[in-house]
Amino acid sequence: MLTVTTFVFSPIAENTYILHNESGDCIIVDPGCYFGNERRELSDTISQNGWRPKYLLNTHCHLDHVFGNKFVSETYDLIPHIHEGEKPVLEYAPAAALKWGMPFENYKGPLEFLEEGDLVKLGDDVLKVLFAPGHSPAHICFYCEADGFVMGGDVLFRNSIGRTDLPGGNHDLLIQKIKDVMYVLPDETIVYPGHGEKTTIGYEKRN
């Protein structure tokens, strides 16, 4: 069983997640820790609980979701796992950050690429990669069928959807992917989004 711990980081209020199992192994999803105190909060939480990070996963590579990639990679010797189509977005992130007045040092090491249908395994727990572009060119989500949740990134929010006015965004595609990828999940599936409070598939379909 995977348990979800949530952090809200940076002036952009991005949700960073740690998924841990009973044995203490864990996955870090979308580390958006920008300030030093935020990075300490993340690492202190991990060390105080005795967790062992095994994966660094990015739903997509907009600046607010990768602020902490370099820190997490260096601290825990992890390689970011992304969709290959997000690589240009990752490379552009520092330039985008300057426009936001939030310069940062980007991760520049090796990458592991994930594709639709791939499985990320942590012991007996499994996350399935869902391909849901539209907010960004190659956005992916991570679905845990056994525990009934999906790490949705910036695809679907409570009472809202991801913005599509950023480079690589496509509104019609996002709407289609929400219908074809997200809304086919069970209604009780919990959605952990990149911003704001969690929701469920059923709630969003009704609203």
Regions from the PLM with identified roles:
Residues 1-49, 141-152:
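Conserved beta-strand hairpin/beta-sheet module of binuclear metal-dependent hydrolase folds
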Residues 7, 19, 117-124:
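Short acidic-hydrophobic surface loop/beta-edge motif
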Residues 7-8, 109-112, 131-133:
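Short Gly/Pro-enriched turn/cap motifs at secondary-structure boundaries
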Residues 17, 112, 117-118, 140, ...:
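Residue-level detector of beta-strand structural context in well-folded domains
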Residues 27, 57, 80, 151, ...:
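Residue-level marker for buried hydrophobic side chains located in beta-strands
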Residues 28-30, 55-58, 129-131:
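Short catalytic-loop micro-motif centered on adjacent basic/acidic residues
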Residues 33-121, 207:
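Active-site HxH/HxHxD metal-binding segment of metal-dependent hydrolases
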Residues 33-34, 51, 96, 125-207:
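Metallo-beta-lactamase
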